[in-house]
Amino acid sequence: LVQQYAPMLAAAASIVGSPAIRNRATIGGNIENASPAGDGLVALYGERAEIKLVSADGTRMVPVSKYVLAPKKTARKQNELIAEIQIPKEGCSHQEFFKQGRRNALAISVVNGCVSADANGDALNHVRVVLGAVAITPVELLEVGELVNGKRYTHELDEQVQKIIESSIHPIDDVRASKEYR
């Protein structure tokens, strides 16, 4: 079901950590960690996921894009638990997750992201681009979607997209990569 209805999440989950980590870790833990480089988290942004939180006070739904506030900081209150992760069933016809790390296995992302779109002849529609590890939270590049929607992807359009990306991200220097590399 995950591969069919949430292919970006399936792709991200298939390359997280080691087999031991993949067999014990949870998507909820990946979300709650709130790492800007979290592969599952970035994929959930791309999938437009919502987090269902429950407590003795009741239940509430929070879009994943509003759930992560900063590294290691989420909108979850101390008395709440993540009960469900809901992903819309209808997704785009083309969905891709990508990751760049310093090695092929057990790599924390230097940058990661996902792109989804519907193709209509030569034009792209419903374009969504999300990047991780380029700011304190994953970044959805709304301007890219607005620019690209309904257009044929050309070299000129690609140059405009690159400018939007450069102005929308705020990478940091850390042990994995310099901000210039990111």
Identify the function of each model-found stretch.
Residues 1-182:
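C-terminal structural segment of proteins
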